From Swiss-Prot:
GO terms for cellular component: centrosome; cytoplasm; gamma-tubulin complex; microtubule. GO terms for molecular function: GTP binding. This is Tubulin gamma-1 chain. It holds the Pfam family Tubulin. It comes from Euplotoides octocarinatus. PANTHER family: TUBULIN. GTP binds at residues 142-148.
Length: 461
């Protein structure tokens, strides 16, 4: 039985990458922009019901809630070819339409004001599911709506659905994208640490470099970057939609990648990557070639994260017509060449999930691969943002912007709490590189968690 997943798209970036994700899913499942199943896709062996439901007229509708505090992006979706795909009851645009002004505090406060309306949408979707497994949140952590509204939504989902999984696709910013982004990011990372079960980190710097260096696009547009993100999102859900023997639900995917509760931030790699089939590389794709390329720094979508540190876990999702014996031989070669450095206290193994490719898309290559990896080097992206925050905070730079919002009008305790959580997260990823990690935090009476505690999802039946 399919286990359904509800997607929440929050803010400009969240809705843009969400839109590209649904376009990709429609193509892969043979669904046209109006939600009608194409004649050639009637007898498919896929699980559409994980992400879609069928309305009374049998057209497919995404299990999605679209949220923004300013209308431009969602209005664009409603005027696009996919306008009739979504359930209009699941769209929220703030009546004031003024956005959050790149202020986490405004986004968070606005979310609190309309929480009943948003939760009613989500509850309605949940009630329409036979066996809801969890939620996916798409957002950016740099601006105001994706970060602030997204943070509040994470807290409420965790409270409201304590036994359901929460996975996010979180876009981390380009340097100096928003002047107050160090504040917005720190406050968001606290919620991603405490209220999500798995966070896929999408680094805008790395995505831009990949577009320039690998796809030879001199000035990548938002649409082209979002297309790369949608490729990763679709590939990471392919085992749920085209199930095999393993990793065919969200629990299985996350459990294989997250060894301890807070170390749940993942990086991704994808190959071969192309936005236009005409520009596909002329090369023979083999399992070994794909798996070797996935470990190369230039293919990883977090800047510089794997240059230092060690892998805690790796899951490669290989799509295409693949002989399992090729996988075994490829893993042996990678082990012999020591292409991946693992932490000393866990299994040094790459897990592989084989998945079918959509029969409705001609990708131009026989084998493609996605790497989902938990690597201690991910802390470098947190450290950069944390250091920027500390620099701003010492000078109280731009703090008056936040003091104008309800959550900060009396005190700045929320900043201090977020500082502590993010610093602890950075320290834990550093400690995870050492053999005695199992004892990390035992001497600290103020620790809010035990790193040896099993993740939430391990107890879900």
């Amino acid at each position: 039985m399919p286990r359904e997943i509800i997607t929440c798209q929050v803010g400009q970036c969240g809705n843009q990458i969400g839109m590209e994700f649904w376009k990709q899913l429609c193509m892969e499942h043979g669904i046209n922009p109006e939600g009608i199943l194409e004649d050639f896709a009637v007898n498919g062996e896929d699980r559409k019901d994980v992400f879609f439901y069928q309305a009374d007229d049998e057209h497919y509708v995404p299990r999605a809630v679209l949220i923004d505090l300013e209308p431009r992006v969602i209005n664009g979706i409603q005027k696009s070819a996919y306008s009739s795909l979504y359930n209009p009851e699941n769209i929220y645009i703030a009546k004031h339409g003024g956005g959050a002004g790149n202020n986490w505090g405004r986004g968070y406060t606005d979310a609190e004001k309309v929480q009943d309306e948003i939760l009613e949408m989500i509850d309605r979707e949940a009630d329409g599911s036979d066996s809801l497994e969890g939620f996916v949140l798409t957002h950016s952590i740099a601006g105001g709506t994706g970060s602030g509204f997204g943070s509040y939504l994470l807290e409420r989902l965790n409270d409201h659905y304590p036994k359901k999984l929460i996975q996010t696709y979180s876009v981390f910013p380009i340097e100096n994208d928003v002047v107050v982004q160090p504040y917005n990011c720190l406050l968001s990372i606290k919620r991603l640490t405490l209220n999500a079960d798995c966070v896929v980190v999408l680094d805008n710097n790395a995505l831009t470099s990949i577009a320039v260096d690998r796809l030879k696009i001199l000035q990548p547009t938002f649409s082209q970057i979002n297309s790369i993100v949608s490729t990763v999102m679709a590939a990471s859900t392919t085992t749920l939609r085209y199930p095999g023997y393993m990793n065919n639900d969200m629990v299985g995917l996350i459990a294989s990648l997250v060894p301890t509760p807070r170390c749940h931030f993942l990086m991704t790699g994808y190959t071969p990557l192309s936005l236009d089939q005409k520009f596909n590389s002329v090369r023979k794709t083999t399992v070994l070639d794909v798996m070797r390329r996935l470990l190369q720094t230039k293919n990883i979508m977090v800047t510089g994260a794997v240059k230092k540190g060690a892998y805690m876990s790796i899951l490669n999702v290989i799509q295409g017509d693949v002989d399992p014996t090729q996988v075994h031989k490829s893993l042996q070669r990678i082990r012999e060449r020591k292409l991946a450095n693992f932490i000393p206290w866990g299994p040094a193994s790459i897990q592989v999930a084989l998945s079918k490719k959509s029969p409705y898309i001609d990708s131009g290559h026989k084998v493609s691969g996605l790497m989902l990896a938990n690597h201690t080097g991910i802390r470098s992206i947190f450290k950069v943002l944390y250091d920027q925050y500390r620099t701003f905070r010492k000078r109280d730079a731009y703090m008056n912007i936040f003091k104008q919002t309800k959550i900060f009008e009396d005190n700045l305790d929320e900043f201090d709490s977020s500082d502590e959580v993010v610093k602890s997260l950075i320290d834990e990823y550093a400690a995870a590189e050492k053999m005695d990690y199992i004892n990390w935090g035992n001497d600290d009476d103020d620790m809010q968690f035990d790193p040896r505690e099993p993740p939430k999802f391990s107890n879900i039946q």
